[in-house]
Amino acid sequence: MKLRPLHDRVVIRRSEEEKKTAGGIVLPGSAAEKANHGEILAVGPGKALESGEVRALSVKVGDKVVFGPYSGSNTVKVDGEDLLVMSENEILAVIEG
């Protein structure tokens, strides 16, 4: 199955969760914090403006992005993988380099 987001939404694969602390202590799955960054897998066509024009998104497929801890509350399971669907305005930054 493939997701095609609508409007200004993006589909993101969350990066692997950190399973160790900085001191090297291994955390059980329930104690590990979910990563707040990931890779964009699909983008919608853009945001519809009042004038009827569509403003293209600032992010593209393949971008590594950072989002807030409560962003992407819409989780969809596709081919056994949990993916996040969120609006572009929930993305805080693009990771470069």
Curated annotation (Swiss-Prot):
A Pfam short name: Cpn10
Primary location: cytoplasm
Keyword Calcium annotated: no
GO BP, sorted A to Z: chaperone cofactor-dependent protein refolding
GO cellular component terms attached to this protein's record: cytoplasm
Alphabetized Gene3D superfamilies for the sequence: GroES chaperonin
UniProt xrefs under InterPro entries: Chaperonin_GroES, Chaperonin_GroES_sf, Chaprnonin_Cpn10_CS, GroES-like_sf
Keywords in alphabetical order: Chaperone, Cytoplasm
Compartments it resides in: Cytoplasm
GO MF terms held by the record: ATP binding; metal ion binding; protein folding chaperone; protein-folding chaperone binding; unfolded protein binding
NCBIfam families to which the protein is assigned, alphabetical: PRK00364.1-2, PRK00364.2-2, PRK00364.2-4
HAMAP family for the chain: CH10 (MF_00580)
Similarity field: Belongs to the GroES chaperonin family.
Main function: Together with the chaperonin GroEL, plays an essential role in assisting protein folding. The GroEL-GroES system forms a nano-cage that allows encapsulation of the non-native substrate proteins and provides a physical environment optimized to promote and accelerate protein folding. GroES binds to the apical surface of the GroEL ring, thereby capping the opening of the GroEL channel.
Assembly and oligomerization: Heptamer of 7 subunits arranged in a ring. Interacts with the chaperonin GroEL.
Stated name of the protein: Co-chaperonin GroES
Organism: Pseudomonas fluorescens (strain Pf0-1)
